[in-house]
Amino acid sequence: MSHHSETILTAILNTKYLENGSKHKIIELPKTNIKKLIKDFLSVNSNKKIQSDCVLINYFPNALLLDNPNKNSSVKKEQTNQVKIIEKPITNNINKPEDIWDIIDNMDKENNSESLENIQSENSENNDNFTDNNTKKSPTKSRICSGCGSKGTLLEDQSSSVLVCSECGMINDDLLDHGPEWRQYYNDDGRGEGVNRCGCPSNFFFPKSSQGTILAGTGSGRLKRKQKWNSTVYKERSLNDVFEKISTICSKSNIPRIIADTAKILYKKLSDCKHKSGNNVGKQIIIRGHNRISIIAACIYKACEMNKNPRTVKEIARFFGIDEKKVTKGNKQFEKIMKNTDDNMIILDPVNSNSTEDYIRRHCPRLKVNKDHTDIAVKISNNCCRMKLASDHNPQSIAAGAILVMVVFCELNIDKRKISRLFGISDVTIDKIYKKIAPYAPALVDDGATDHLINKLKING
């Protein structure tokens, strides 16, 4: 190290110690005046039109730590007096400057070492837990050999399906394979029949046909189907025909699948009902002929009500291509059989099974009415039922009248004929309900106003 660089380094270190109030010992300055050297250097480079700060930074990287020459003279005298207080110089690391990058590298190394130690400790803990869990789960680790009495020496021989001791070679127990017999890749091997050796699971709709194991033949597919149907119970064969008819009608009429499944369950439970009185006590109720079609239509009608997606009798009759009277007759017969069934066999919710809200929420999207206006129509219909303004009409007619009141109240451009055609109700019926509801429309829109009218008029008591 040259004399000039050593002088600059010593001055910078002393100034830093004094500013930070460090307890390090002050290093003795060389006899050469550092400030005079810097002034000489700046005077030499001033002709080159270079800024003094840039020159200092380029040639003396730590020169900014020195005192500013513009400071008060009193502060300079105090600092020079402090520098003159000399103790014994520190012999260690005088010639080595403190590099900030070395400090950062050392800190990174310490952090990396700490993280590695943490990872190693976590891995060791996980390994210990894994071994503990294995010893708890595996029964062979804790079992004792019946031949030599050693513990933890039993091994599972999968090829022979036995539990063998690794010390004495004695067979202690047999093993059972709880996995599948073999895997089936959905007949990708080209074989027509399946390779499973067990039958299908029990079916709620066909309990008798799902029992036992069906052995498939090697003939053509048509013979297999005949063999399958010949082995099926007659009653379940007729049930399958009914279920196919329900599925076909629901799919053609855009009825959701959940309604079709509910209708199948209702028909299945009705077919299992038995007579409770008369000459046929204990015998199952037989449903056949035209009576069966009416019962199927009634099951779909009830399933729509149970799933809050009601259909009118006229719609159900149109789906099946039968008269409305047959649908009504089927509903009456359905209720009659339901009364004669065992307790809790068929559970129907008589309350709110067919409400005005269900009809409104079903038909408003077809009228291109948004959700806010739909909620207003629902509120009008509910408050109308609470005030008993149109109690002599069915829910479908009240829903149509509530939609018409909402259209007039909100000033929407929807024709009354379109509502009557969509609901299947005459214009006269809608006009009757409208005249009953329209005078109370401002109150029916607000639940608080409706409550006030109910209390004032004492409608509910």
From Swiss-Prot:
It comes from the Viruses. Keywords: Metal-binding, Repeat, Transcription, Transcription regulation, Zinc, Zinc-finger. The keyword tRNA-binding does not apply. It holds the Pfam family Zn_Ribbon_TF. Residues 121-137 have a biased composition (Low complexity). GO terms for molecular function: TBP-class protein binding; zinc ion binding. This is Putative transcription initiation factor IIB-like protein. Zn(2+) binds at residues 145, 165, 168. Coiled coil: none annotated. GO terms for cellular component: transcription preinitiation complex. A zinc finger (TFIIB-type) spans 141-173. Sequence repeats lie at residues 246-327, 360-430. Residues 113-142 are annotated as: Disordered. Belongs to the TFIIB family. One of its GO terms (biological process) is transcription preinitiation complex assembly. The keyword Nucleus does not apply. InterPro entries: Cyclin-like_sf, TFIIB, TFIIB_cyclin, Znf_TFIIB.
